[in-house]
Amino acid sequence: MKKALIVIDMQNDFIDGSLGTPEAKAIVLAVTEKVKAAVQAGEKLVFTQDTHHSDYLKTAEGEKLPVEHCIKPSHGWGLVSSLIPYAKDAIVLEKPTFGATGLPQHVADCEEITVVGLCTDICVISNAMLLKSFLPEASIRVDSTCCAGVTPESHTRALEAMKMCHIEVL
């Protein structure tokens, strides 16, 4: 069975930068270990990077969330340091929106796809739902121990919403 691990937005700004949270910091080691295990198992590895530019505050998202973050090529835009060594041999998708619309084509040959990362209630749920919509016969899973939301409550609500849409929550 061909498997993939999708790592959503494990970027400095979401961990200890402008939108960082203690919960995001707390999952870094678990995500790094999950990535290491996936690489050792020969799984396909995909990273997404939330990618904005200097005009972010003038965008629709910037008007609703007026906090500059993940401005390419700032330090905050970069992947957390523990994951950088793994990115060189992975697929890395820059995305200007919550969902990486090109993501399904990169994992269409996989039967089991696990999603981890940040933020559970925004980009993780968006990409998990995108994958489920485009690849309805694939097993789409979200490892809740390797995700964090904007708040613990919104993290839990997002996991419940994904369960309702037949996404397996681990």
Region locations from a protein language model:
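A general structural motif
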Residues: 1-2, 42, 109-113, 137
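Short, glycine/serine-rich, charged loops/turns that create anion-binding
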Residues: 11-12, 52, 97, 120-122, ...
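Conserved strand-to-helix beginnings and helix N-cap segments that scaffold or border functional pockets
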Residues: 104, 125-128, 152-156
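Histidine-anchored nucleotide/phosphate-binding helix
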Residues: 33-37, 125-135
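A short glycine-rich beta-strand->turn/loop micro-motif centered on a GG-aromatic cluster
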Residues: 114-118, 137-150
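Short, conserved acidic/polar surface loops in the N-terminal third of protein domains
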Residues: 56-60, 103-105, 126
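Active-site acidic carboxylates
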Residues: 1-92, 141, 150, 156-163, ...
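Internal catalytic-core helix/loop-beta-alpha segment
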Residues: 73-122
